[in-house]
């Protein structure tokens, strides 16, 4: 059985590595996903990243991915974010390396509960919660249901109701990544989507087909300081639609970036990370 290896273990060498492999506990890790065997699965798989000074105790950040994806897709966020924060990147049930727990029923509420279980496993009582696309919807439900565990909330291109892509492009992944995405990036995502975890994709799809966070009163229950980031030409929803749900979150603001992608956490990662870090810094200074 493959075991995830920490950055610290990788740096300290073989003796520590051997001790780690002898342990019965599978730990989160900071090394690339290829270090985890493709057939390795567990009920609550997550990756953990901390690239700052080892004597610091960083604040935790939970990164929630979207459908058809896994924790790997936060690759662009790790180098900058992990220098300031301890990153917890779960694979949602049925995706990546996470099994579907016995009796699990897909809904935003159950997915939010799953995130709490990952946090419990990681020893994290509360965290900054960040979600992209479907992960943004899960993040909003999490913040509403678990206010004491939510320090801040960042929603990066997440919908508040079922998706309806306007005038979809005939080119796979072009709507997702936008017209400026290089060919290599499009090819990578096409390869990623050619081998999806069907059970997880179907389950998340069902959960995302029957929800309305505004009508259900979820948005109004979010008390954490919230940043919503959207694109000015996203085919997932217009700026007006994003603003319509953002204003229902009591302590929130909207940032609009110039892009025709709807997966801006990937396509416009640097800009989204910059806004996120500035927001988190501002919230910290305000307390």
Predicted regions and their residues:
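Hydrophobic, aromatic-rich cap/lid helix
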Residues: 189-216, 233
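Conserved HGGG/HGGXW glycine-rich cap/lid loop of the alpha/beta-hydrolase fold
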Residues: 48-97
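Active-site loop/oxyanion-hole signature of alpha/beta-hydrolase fold enzymes
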Residues: 47-50, 79, 89-130, 274
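Conserved alpha/beta-hydrolase "acid-adjacent" motif
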Residues: 235-241
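Catalytic active-site module of serine/aspartate enzymes centered on a nucleophile-bearing elbow/loop
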Residues: 252, 256-287
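Short beta-strand/loop motif that positions the catalytic acidic residue
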Residues: 222, 228-230
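N-terminal export signals
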Residues: 2-3, 9-28
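Flexible "cap/lid" loop of the alpha/beta hydrolase fold
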Residues: 137-145, 150-178
